[in-house]
Amino acid sequence: MVGGDEVIANSFLEAGELVSFKRGEDIVSQGDVEDDSVYFLLSGAADVFVNGKRRDDIQRTAPITVGEMSALNPAQKRSATVRAASRQLVALKVEGETFRKVVGENREFLRRVHEDFSGRGRQAILATGISRRTSGWNWTVISLTAGVLSAAAIWYTLRVDGNPVFVRVLLPLVVGLTIFLLTLLADPVYRFFRLGTLCVGAILVDEALQWQVRGSFMGAEFQYQISSSGDPQQATALLAPIVLGALAAYLFWIDTTKR
């Protein structure tokens, strides 16, 4: 950030203080408004934590500055916690007032500060996109687990004698599927792709198989029969899954490139 400017470097060296941190010690703390100092990391690396969670995609490694945003806006709270990740981290601590004074006296330095802010903003946006891409299927597993547990709970409740077989079988399936879909739709990542895939899969199964259910409403057990579809006219119905598949692919492309 100093860009080899000896005048600026000497100003910071004269006013600054060498400080060291051991692994696990906080350099700056999220939400802090009292400390508006800037830390020029001279050696070592630090991890970034937001709301107590470590950002695996972001690490501050020397030479780099930490805390300049709060130095320029002293009333602003620290947006993240920066914690020493190296065995020992050495930094030059410059008070926020000194940093603001140097920035105000040197336009070129101010331009470099803004460029650094812009670069970190792009990095954060990129990291957010990557995080969203990798978390989509994790949410699918969560949704499936919620659906299975809900279905199991309903089945356990209705397992006692006296309930018709179709109630003990059908109701848990309906509840489980409903909970699965509701949980799935709660996650905005790839919802169109997964929902479209679910629709296509359901239609393909329906077209490929014949379903028969036999039995009386009261008392008698139901007989289920599933067989391959032998009707050649059903091949024309594959147009619907193809259209839905194309739509799902288009929405998936929007999710991955436009968001």
From Swiss-Prot:
UniProt region (TIR-like), positions on chain: 126-229
Which Pfam family, any one, appears in the UniProt record? Answer: cNMP_binding
**Record bears the keyword Transmembrane helix:** yes
Q: Which GO terms describe its biological process?
A: defense response to virus
What residues bind a nucleoside 3',5'-cyclic phosphate, as annotated? Answer: 1-120
Look up and give the organism this protein is from. Rhodovulum sp. (strain MB263)
What gene makes this protein?
pycTIR
Q: Name one GO molecular function term.
A: hydrolase activity
Please give the name of this protein: Pycsar effector protein RsmPycTIR
The entry's keywords: Antiviral defense, Cell inner membrane, Cell membrane, Hydrolase, Membrane, Nucleotide-binding, Transmembrane, Transmembrane helix
Q: Which GO terms describe its cellular component?
A: plasma membrane
Per UniProt, what is the membrane topology?
A: Multi-pass membrane protein
Q: Which domain of life is it from?
A: Bacteria
